Amino acid sequence: MDQQAIYAELNLPTDSGPESSSPSSLPRDVCQGSPWHQFALKLSCAGIILLVLVVTGLSVSVTSLIQKSSIEKCSVDIQQSRNKTTERPGLLNCPIYWQQLREKCLLFSHTVNPWNNSLADCSTKESSLLLIRDKDELIHTQNLIRDKAILFWIGLNFSLSEKNWKWINGSFLNSNDLEIRGDAKENSCISISQTSVYSEYCSTEIRWICQKELTPVRNKVYPDS
């Protein structure tokens, strides 16, 4: 008997095992986030940076103001200290050859001149002919005159237009201040001696008295340490 080959086609399911294909990639928005999320994140970062800059700027400004205030305070303290050392009221002092009388310095001339020339000489010394305010000042001035026979011009003459005795500062004589011996007339000027007050012709050559204010001498007084 002829053996007949029998062929059978086996259609066995092939087991390909696990899928060899690469896993599908994750969605892009899982890693990178949505556009709104990215915008919010950037905005937050920008806000934080801006806040840091503002805080830093404020800190610098405050520090600068504090330093400026400290410097100004130190400057004020130094100036006040200088004022204490140089600007405290000091003694009052007259120039050499001048004599002190109250708050005035007086210079008694040793030469003679007419009244107008005497007035000009005092002006060159940054002073004026003597102005006497009251009887008490007159007496104190006369006490400084050593010789009874010597006369001295003062800053008082007769104003013909106003028919009155007028001081060189523009004020008029109070009749109670000086008891004048002599006439009140044109070209009359006043002189004083150790004992009296006289009206003389302004052209008469006699001595004169200049006056100036006392000069303050600033003493250095150092502040307590």
UniProtKB/Swiss-Prot annotation:
GO terms for cellular component: cell surface; plasma membrane. It is a single-pass type II membrane protein. N-glycosylated. Contains sialic acid residues. Glycans are attached at N157. The chain crosses the membrane at residues 46-66. Residues 1-45 are cytoplasmic. Residues 67-225 are extracellular. Induction: By IL12/interleukin-12 in NK cells. InterPro entries: C-type_lectin-like, C-type_lectin-like/link_sf, CTDL_fold, KLR_subfamily_B, NKR-like_CTLD. Expressed in a subset of NK cells predominantly in intestinal epithelium and liver. Detected in peripheral blood T-cells and preferentially in adult T-cells with a memory antigenic phenotype. GO terms for biological process: cell surface receptor signaling pathway; regulation of natural killer cell mediated cytotoxicity. It is found in: Membrane. GO terms for molecular function: carbohydrate binding; signaling receptor activity; transmembrane signaling receptor activity. Disulfide bonds join C94-C105, C122-C210, C189-C202. Residues 101-211 form the C-type lectin domain. Plays an inhibitory role on natural killer (NK) cells cytotoxicity. Activation results in specific acid sphingomyelinase/SMPD1 stimulation with subsequent marked elevation of intracellular ceramide. Activation also leads to AKT1/PKB and RPS6KA1/RSK1 kinases stimulation as well as markedly enhanced T-cell proliferation induced by anti-CD3. Acts as a lectin that binds to the terminal carbohydrate Gal-alpha(1,3)Gal epitope as well as to the N-acetyllactosamine epitope. Homodimer; disulfide-linked. Interacts with acid sphingomyelinase/SMPD1. This is Killer cell lectin-like receptor subfamily B member 1. It comes from Homo sapiens.
